[in-house]
A protein has these predicted regions:
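PLD/PLD-like phosphodiesterase catalytic module centered on the HKD motif
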Residues: 10, 16-61, 160-165, 170-249
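Signature of lipid phosphatidyltransferase scaffolds
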Residues: 52-137, 141, 241-249
Length: 254
């Protein structure tokens, strides 16, 4: 219990993604002193468009100094997998000033769900830089003027000279991304994409498979992960760039 404690725990969960979670679960969290808020609550999905505007971010920030992000949600299936295989995912730990970017993303989301604007410097403590790697936190949303993530991917693909490797659970690229990948492959860049042989949603997986022939004709190499469900979203390029994405190569994630 956090009652009477100086520690503050905030949980922002997606309301649609947690439809099957009983209300008692959140009541117990709040009773223990945890602030839990659902993102864009949907009670009657047939009568609202909010069901399409979901929050797919997985962010943990601890004391403003350490953060975790990646593909992992919090559920038993992420540990136990399926009867037909493991759940393969990637999550990363971040230390240093890049944590500020994830803290900003979380607090912005918190304002949406709680209407509390949090700007205290205690959430952005001064800290030294770690190592010499450059890191940028890029966020995107459906109402922004620019599709920052898609534009960043386009720049990364067009800038690659030797290789560009992708892991993604769902391969539903926008037309610009698809064209960029094929163009790079035709120009001699080693383009490799790994997707799961079997996915958690059949319809989405069939849609992903529909792109493969066209891409392979352009020279893109396709690999199927066979040990279970691949949920990891990774990009590695030219020994100079790596990303751990929440973006799933899906037009809905622009």
């Amino acid at each position: 219990s956090l009652v009477g404690s100086e520690m503050c725990i905030r949980d922002r969960y997606d309301d649609v993604g947690c439809w099957k979670v009983p209300h008692l679960f959140y009541d117990e969290m709040r009773g223990a002193g945890i602030e839990a808020r659902g993102f864009l609550k949907v009670r009657f999905p047939v009568f609202t468009s909010k069901v399409n505007y979901r929050n797919h971010r997985k962010i943990v920030v601890i004391d403003g100094k350490v953060a975790f992000t990646g593909g992992m949600n919090i559920a038993l299936r992420y540990m136990k997998g399926f009867q037909w295989g493991i759940w393969r995912d990637t999550h990363i730990k971040i230390e240093g000033k890049a944590v500020y970017g994830l803290q900003t993303a979380f607090l912005t989301d918190w304002y949406v769900v709680d209407r509390t604007l949090i700007t205290s410097s205690r959430y952005f403590p001064e800290m030294d830089s770690y190592g010499n790697a450059l890191m940028q936190i890029v966020t995107s949303d459906p109402v922004g003027e620019w599709r920052d993530i898609m534009q960043g991917l386009l720049i990364a693909i067009s800038s690659s000279r030797k290789y560009f490797y992708i892991q993604t659970p769902y391969l539903l690229p926008t037309e610009p991304i698809l064209m960029a990948l094929k163009t790079a492959a035709l120009a001699g860049v080693d383009i490799r994409i790994m997707i799961p042989e079997r996915a958690d949603t059949r319809l989405t997986h069939l849609a992903s498979l529909s792109y493969l022939d066209d891409m392979m004709r352009a020279g893109v190499k396709i690999y199927l992960y066979q040990k279970g469900f691949l949920h990891s979203k990774l990009i590695v390029s030219d020994d100079t760039l790596s990303t751990c994405l929440l973006y799933t190569s899906d037009a809905a994630d622009e």
